[in-house]
Amino acid sequence: MCLLARVRHIEITPDVNGNMFFWHFQNKHIANKQRTVIWLNGGPGCSSEDGALMEIGPYRLKDKDTLVYNEGAWNEFANVLFVDNPVGTGFSYVDTNAYVRELDVMADQFVTFLEKWFKLFPEYEHDDIFIAGESYAGQYIPYIAKAILERNKKGGESSYKWNLAGLLIGNGWISPPEQYEAYLQFAYEKGIVKKGSDAASKLEVQQRICSKQLAVGPALVDNTDCEKILQDLLQLTATSKGGEQRCVNMYDVRLTDTYPSCGMNWPPDLDAVTPYLRRNDVIQALHVNPNKVTGWVECNGQVGANFKPSSKPSVELLPDLLKEVPIILFSGSEDLICNHLGTEALISNLQWNGGKGFEITPGTWAPRRDWTFEGEAAGFWQEARNLTYVVFYNSSHMVPFDYPRRTRDMLDRFMGVDISSIGGKPTDSRLDGEKVPETTVGGVAGNGTDAQQAEKEKLDTARWEAYRKSGEIVLVIVAFSAAGWGWWVWRERKKRRGYMGVSGGENISPSGEARGREGFRDKRSAADLEAGDFDENELDDLHMRTPTTVMGGEGNDPRYSVGAASEDSEDEEDVKGKGKEKMSG
């Protein structure tokens, strides 16, 4: 199977060398209509290659040299466009004095990117467009959606209205007041902090300071006093073991990490992704502009340090967006930094489309419907008035990392994928025990492990049949050749007996041995994306052969997240944020 992928930079702000990098994968199947999903990781300053190679892209890295197929990839029924946003993130770049500071500026630049992208690829401009992401993308996505809707309303003869069909935000940083307060609440619920303990008393004091700041100050995306709640929580709950301090992994509380990393060494795939994206052959295959002089880092600390928006938090944009666009918020149950309790609190306090929270009539709330996926308890769904909320059980901050197939089921359901014209075995996905509209995850006709195995067996059978027929032909040829050879030998011997006295009796040996067959062998092994030769002067199309042998399974503020400088530059730090400089998502 071959996948069509396109990669390159698009210039956004030429006066400051602002360029954005994208990686686009074409869909494998078209189910009733064309769709494009735009994926953004968070940070701010964290690369969407995280999403491409560790979450929803068609490949995962088994190690730094081996790509394997991701059975839950989101490009089954949708084109997927990964963008390193804002400028300076991942393979994107900009002059160091021109990093983005505000969310509205970021959104305007992203619309500029899309305008230029659709000029390059006009065949996708009529697609249903979905914008998805996680963590600090909970700020990016609503602002970008607002900018797109405003662009559509301005119109113009040359402006086609983009069909913004939906937004998906996973473990998003959306509403600081509720989400800051949820740190300690979540820690109590999970037993990380015991109520009444010294640690609890100290954290409650800091939470009161935070609440006071939020009450008197302007509504901002982040607050230093509130950030300290999480910093103190991780420090106060750290333990010593074997001379090493360990702390809770803030992205998956089932795990621990060395202090003060507390999750920055996670996920484990990062150990392979970073060296892979720094390989010269990969950089060349991805057509990374030579003007990008530093190596890839997951999160650019300078982007995060400069991103200090005075913009209002994105939660304030949701009511108007929900009038026009369906939104799905989803949460991994084991994430601390953007935990589900905070998301549920912000939904409960939100007023939209004539109601508050998930109240469907006065005193009646939309039910939480138990979700099972292939016979296992997967989480629950809740929805009302254009907003859907999904919790994934036993999952981290990066839900698609843990459950790519379940998130694909969620995506297909949200997009309204109709598989009736495609075939394949429907996925057993149920809400409250009832079969829901059918989706297919890894089981589309001609796709998935079963189909691939059947196709392999079919090809093997055809191959051996060809060999058998070829063998029969060869036997006939050999028989005729042997007869001809025998006749030729008999004739030559007869000649030599007549000319022996003249020729001196030398035996004339025929020369018929072929030479140089090694030169015809293609010694290049089955290739992943970097193996082919690409013309730098042409549109950057990467045709990637799907591996089938291995299948993938299911700043200046005292912010905790600021990490060590990267190997490449003091200006770039490998930082994770929640959104904020706290998470790669």
UniProtKB/Swiss-Prot annotation:
Q: Quick one: where's region Disordered?
A: 526-585
Q: What EC number(s) does this enzyme carry? A: 3.4.16.6
In its UniProt record, a GO molecular function of this protein is: serine-type carboxypeptidase activity
Leader sequence residues: 1-18
Acidic residues composition bias: which ranges? 530-539
Q: Name one GO biological process term.
A: proteolysis
Per the UniProt entry, the glycosylated residues are: 386, 394, 447
Q: State which ranges are Cytoplasmic (membrane side).
A: 491-585
| Membrane-topology descriptor | Single-pass type I membrane protein
Catalytic residue list: 135, 335, 397
What reaction is this protein's catalytic activity?
Answer: Preferential release of a C-terminal arginine or lysine residue
- List all membrane-crossing ranges: 470-490
Biological function: Protease with a carboxypeptidase B-like function involved in the C-terminal processing of the lysine and arginine residues from protein precursors. Promotes cell fusion and is involved in the programmed cell death.
Q: What is this protein called?
A: Pheromone-processing carboxypeptidase KEX1
Specify the species.
Podospora anserina (strain S / ATCC MYA-4624 / DSM 980 / FGSC 10383) (Pleurage anserina)
Name the lineage: Eukaryota, Fungi, Dikarya, Ascomycota, Pezizomycotina
The gene name on file is KEX1
